[in-house]
């Protein structure tokens, strides 16, 4: 077998994540999937927490592409596009939201975070406002992903069990259909635009 490297460990762990979810993911079964003894894995990931942190970082590196503003992009468009890209990256993998929850920027992400803050400060926000804007939208996006993925998992369980049809009132019937129609995309964009509109008000009131 060729020499094991961390990239292979993470790639195989991501495949396994889609198969078993975060609860079923262990360093033991990652080692089994790769075909090595568990102690060999410890050269690259010391424990499950280190494995999850590495997975979170890799998911963003591979799939979160709109991390910095494009030339002439407005701060509103950047926040919107950044959040959409972040959400899409987390939805690429089973339990992607849970994998990311609780993490902080790694050293490789420091410069990106610095440039994001500087961009918002240059747009007129104070540093604290820039921090709150970025963190609030990130937390909302993560919450949206967690809710979407939990709904997907619970829906799979419901489909395994025969249940009686529930008779909803007319408006609630339509509301359920709306919420189930597009994986939560429209609801996410609606609230995201509300948040950005609120930030526009904050910026205007500061002038």
From Swiss-Prot:
It comes from the Bacteria. Residues 26-45 bind DNA. Tetracycline binds at residues 64, 82. InterPro entries: DNA-bd_HTH_TetR-type_CS (IPR023772), Homeodomain-like_sf (IPR009057), HTH-type_TetR-like_transc_reg (IPR050109), HTH_TetR (IPR001647), Repressor_TetR_C (IPR004111), Tet_transcr_reg_TetR (IPR003012), Tet_transcr_reg_TetR-rel_C_sf (IPR036271). Keywords: Antibiotic resistance, DNA-binding, Magnesium, Metal-binding, Plasmid, Repressor, Transcription, Transcription regulation. GO terms for biological process: negative regulation of DNA-templated transcription; response to antibiotic. Residues 3-63 form the HTH tetR-type domain. Mg(2+) binds at residue 100. One of its GO terms (molecular function) is transcription cis-regulatory region binding. Induction: By the [Mg-tetracycline]+ complex. TetR is the repressor of the tetracycline resistance element; its N-terminal region forms a helix-turn-helix structure and binds DNA. Binding of tetracycline to TetR reduces the repressor affinity for the tetracycline resistance gene (tetA) promoter operator sites. This is Tetracycline repressor protein class H. It comes from Pasteurella multocida.
């Amino acid at each position: 077998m060729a020499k094991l490297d961390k990239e292979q460990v993470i790639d195989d762990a991501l495949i396994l994540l889609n198969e078993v979810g975060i609860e079923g993911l262990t360093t033991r079964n990652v080692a089994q999937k790769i075909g090595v003894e568990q102690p060999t894995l410890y050269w690259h990931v010391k424990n499950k927490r280190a494995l999850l942190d590495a997975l979170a970082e890799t998911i963003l590196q591979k799939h979160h592409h709109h991390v910095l503003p494009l030339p002439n992009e407005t701060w509103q468009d950047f926040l919107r596009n950044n959040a959409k890209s972040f959400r899409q990256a987390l939805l690429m993998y089973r339990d992607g939201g849970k994998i990311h929850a609780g993490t902080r920027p790694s050293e490789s992400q420091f410069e990106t975070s610095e440039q994001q803050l500087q961009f918002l400060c240059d747009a007129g926000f104070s540093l604290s406002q820039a921090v709150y804007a970025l963190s609030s939208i990130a937390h909302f996006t993560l919450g949206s992903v967690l809710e979407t993925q939990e709904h997907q998992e619970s829906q799979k369980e419901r489909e395994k069990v025969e249940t009686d049809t529930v008779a909803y009132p007319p408006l609630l019937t339509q509301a359920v259909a709306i919420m189930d129609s597009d994986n939560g995309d429209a609801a996410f964009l609606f609230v995201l635009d509300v948040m950005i509109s609120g930030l526009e008000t904050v910026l205007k009131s500061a002038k």
